[in-house]
Amino acid sequence: MMTVPFSQPEKHSMTTMKAVGFNRPLPASDENCLLDIELPAPEPKPHDLLVEVRAVSVNPADVKVRAVHTPAEGKYRVLGWDAAGVVKAVGSEVRGFKAGDEVYYAGAINRQGSYAQLQAVDSRIAAKKPRTLDFAQAAALPLTALTAWETLFDRLDVNKPVAGDSRALLLVGGAGGVGSITVQLLKTLTDIQIIATASRPESEAWLRRLGADFVINHHHSLPEQVEKLGIGTPSWAFSTSHTEHYLPQLAELLAPQGRIALIDDPAALDANPLKGKSISLHWEFMFTRPLRETADIARQGEILAKVAQLVDEGRLHSTVTQTINGINAANLRRAHQMVERGDMVGKVVLAGW
């Protein structure tokens, strides 16, 4: 393996570590799209934890960045925005953590990721992992749990009713990582009826096990299917993919003054159909708080702590559906291919070095 510098300027010790990185955008089918490399170990900044990574999960964000990002010449980008591991050292401003703590986190998109034996992560966006989960089970949760929580409670504000309409939420693309935890949070923390979409029998069965009240097919007319349910007009909609296709249907079926959230990246989006009903549109980008270092950056650590509590109480469950032993380039390429196909149910996790 070759030793190369980080793509982000950080202070390093002389210790090296195994990592998986890339130096040019390539398709997941190319054996050089991800490479086993060796890097200097990061040194924690004042607010940082230095974590020995035990397990990671792969998300659509990893696939998107790998496919389009070109690191600076001679440098490698390390992906990975889900991890669970053990704290090895803490920065001078860290409170509430110590060496030996078992933690989980998503991290920040503007820093090196978790495909490495050691990772420096801001302690304010991390939490102690659920005690009842192993590292692999815990690593499946952070990014999707944060995305789902922020969407439901910060963007859609589901605790604030839409006057005169059904307390129902339509979740487009329910069986993936984000959808799987969204269903659980709604079922556990609200009395909202959950309408989730799926197109395959295994996806429908998965959603019903998680707690969806109704499952409809996103390949057919959403307004017609929702009307046939006989539960009234939904107040909220959460679109996880292909929003440019579904937005006109969501505008038709949603209640006046309803709210729509999305997390994908449509090339163009015509929001004019929303005006006649005063429907609001909200983007959720989980990395906003750490990327912009917002005043409430610590809310992410608080959310993950609450999620861990709910897991340990048996009220939330890990969404891992496949675990691959060994964090290395070959296995990560395989996981990227699985995510790229777009038919994942739950999450794929890699554990151990």
Model-predicted segments: where are they?
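C-terminal capping/lid region of NAD(P)-dependent oxidoreductase domains
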Residues: 12-15, 315-322, 333-353
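Glycine-rich beta-strand-centered segment in the early N-terminal region that forms part
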Residues: 40-57, 67-110
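Residue-level marker of beta-strand positions
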Residues: 101-102, 118, 259
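A structural motif shared across PLP-dependent enzymes of the aminotransferase-like
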Residues: 110-123
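Short, glycine/polar-rich helix-capping loops at beta-to-alpha or helix-loop-helix junctions
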Residues: 114-115, 198-206, 268-271
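Mid-domain Rossmann-like dinucleotide-binding core that forms the NAD(H)/NADP(H) cofactor-binding site
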Residues: 141-220
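Glycine-rich cofactor phosphate-binding loops and adjacent beta1-alpha1 units
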Residues: 160-162, 214-284
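C-terminal substrate-binding/catalytic core of Rossmann-like NAD(P)-dependent dehydrogenases/reductases
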Residues: 273-323
